[in-house]
Amino acid sequence: GLLGLGYGGY
């Protein structure tokens, strides 16, 4: 996800 901002955590 995007910088781990709740969008996958990556």
UniProtKB/Swiss-Prot annotation:
Keywords in alphabetical order: Cuticle
Listed GO MF terms: structural constituent of cuticle
Function: Component of the cuticle of migratory locust which contains more than 100 different structural proteins.
Record-given protein name: Cuticle protein 30
Organism: Locusta migratoria
Species classification: Eukaryota, Metazoa, Ecdysozoa, Arthropoda, Hexapoda
